[in-house]
A protein has these predicted regions:
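Terminal amphipathic alpha-helical/low-complexity segments used for targeting or macromolecular assembly
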Residues: 1-13, 18-19, 25, 61, ...
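Structural signal for interior beta-strand "rungs" in well-ordered beta-sheet cores
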Residues: 3-190, 194-195
Length: 268
């Protein structure tokens, strides 16, 4: 069975296993390797010297730059060749020398990356990470195993995120930071150790948050970080804000639910 679409363009120096599934108008550039269990969606481009292996699915319209290693075995000494996967969505830009690993059986066996993300050069997404949509990982960012990066989060260059940590939606982590606890949604933080520095106001405005949502989130942030309340007391106050700011109920719910679900604790 031939799984390579006739419109796909494969450079003569590339090595593509005949069992791989290659979609319409895919470009596989010079010296790339595509393994037997790989599925590549329509119009995805592998520039050159790209490795895609393991049980990996790349969606449509992705662009992968030289030196990237996609779907390689996890950097986990417990890994023993189990059948685990990497699933990547659509329209991602994966720059030079990025590494995205398959999952492990110690978690759900899947590393999942959404769509419309930008992975700058040398970024690392370890096993069992969950990366949402519209995120940015700047140069040399390293996500350890089991990290969750929610939609539209931004992580600055040279930053490391400890295993099992979560970075919330629309949060921004400054460069050269060390994230060892959860970063709540909508927050800006920096440092080693990473500490909060208020809301990501510029990012929220750019994302179209309205005035009521911004005011409500300021109050929620204050309850969590500035009023010397326990987490339980802060969550009660955040819940009460939904009555005062009904248009902000959704973002307040997400903020509160994220805080309540934290097992590693929050940055402080």
């Amino acid at each position: 069975m031939v799984n390579i679409h006739p419109t796909a363009r494969i450079h003569p120096t590339a090595l593509v296993d005949e069992r791989a599934t290659i979609g319409q108008d895919v470009v596989v550039g010079p010296f790339c390797y595509v393994g037997p269990d790989v599925k590549i969606g329509d119009r995805t481009v592998l520039r050159s010297h790209v490795t895609v292996e393991g049980r990996t699915t790349l969606g449509a319209d992705n662009v992968v730059y030289p030196g990237a290693a996609i779907g390689c075995e996890p950097q986990d000494k417990k890994y023993a060749g189990e059948d685990t996967v990497l699933v990547v969505g659509d329209r991602n830009v994966i720059r030079e020398n990025c590494t995205l690993s398959i999952g492990t059986v110690q978690d759900e066996g899947i590393t999942r990356v959404g769509s419309d993300n930008l992975f700058m050069a040398n970024a690392h997404v370890a096993h069992d990470c969950l990366v949402g949509n519209g995120t940015i990982l700047a140069n040399n960012v390293a996500l350890a195993g089991h990290v969750t990066l929610e939609d539209y989060a931004i992580v600055g260059g040279q930053t490391g995120v400890h295993q099992f940590c979560r970075v919330g939606a629309h949060a921004m982590v400054g460069g050269v930071a060390a994230v060892t606890r959860d970063v709540p949604p909508y927050v800006i933080c920096a440092g080693n150790p990473c500490v909060p520095h208020g809301l990501n106001l510029v990012g929220l405005r750019r994302s179209g948050f309205n005035d009521d949502q911004m005011r409500a989130l300021r109050r929620a942030y204050g309850a969590l970080y500035r009023e010397n309340l326990t987490v339980k007391e802060a969550l009660e106050k955040i819940e009460a804000l939904k009555t005062e700011f009904p248009d902000a109920a959704e973002v307040l719910t997400h903020f509160g639910d994220f805080v309540a679900a934290s097992t590693r604790g929050l940055i402080r």
